[in-house]
């Protein structure tokens, strides 16, 4: 199964944070699943790093590719269809990064691994 990680799920997985549910961890660790991280999440993390709200274990351009490879996590590019879908979404959520994740989930029919229950209002499949 293809699964799209919300940014917090990715970070909590990497840091072995107890906030990541046991079920979410199982989904991510299941080698039969194709785990994806949106390019939007990379942008979100980069902004948080530049604002001093996030620290990671090294330089962004070295740490992120290393962790993606180490954990067999693929990147989901942002397509025109994804950005067009954002324009049609109701405003259940104002966070632009989360709205892009919702659009990617809907367009690509890929469930989101996230603790954020507001995603449910969009009709996406959320796994936690």
Where are the language model's segments positioned?
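Phosphate/NTP-binding elements of NTP-utilizing enzymes
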Residues: 45
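Acidic, glycine-centered active-site loop in nucleotide-sugar glycosyltransferases
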Residues: 122-128
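Short, well-structured N-terminal submotif of metal-dependent ribonuclease cores
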Residues: 1-37, 51-66, 108, 117, ...
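Short, conserved active-site loop motifs that form the nucleotide-linked donor/cofactor pocket
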Residues: 33, 73, 124
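Active-site neighborhoods of divalent-metal-dependent phosphate/nucleic-acid chemistry enzymes
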Residues: 55-58, 65-115, 127
């Amino acid at each position: 199964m293809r699964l799209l990680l919300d940014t917090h799920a990715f970070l909590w997985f990497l840091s072995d944070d107890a906030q990541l549910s046991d079920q979410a961890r199982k989904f991510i660790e299941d080698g039969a699943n194709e785990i994806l991280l949106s390019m939007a999440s990379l942008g979100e993390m980069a902004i948080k790093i530049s604002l001093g709200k996030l620290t990671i274990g090294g330089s962004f351009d070295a740490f992120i590719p290393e962790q993606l490879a180490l954990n067999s996590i693929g990147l989901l590019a942002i397509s025109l269809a994804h950005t067009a879908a954002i324009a049609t979404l109701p405003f259940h959520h104002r966070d632009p990064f989360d709205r892009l994740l919702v659009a990617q989930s809907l367009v690509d029919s890929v469930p989101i691994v996230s603790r954020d229950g507001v995603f449910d209002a969009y009709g996406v499949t959320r796994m936690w």
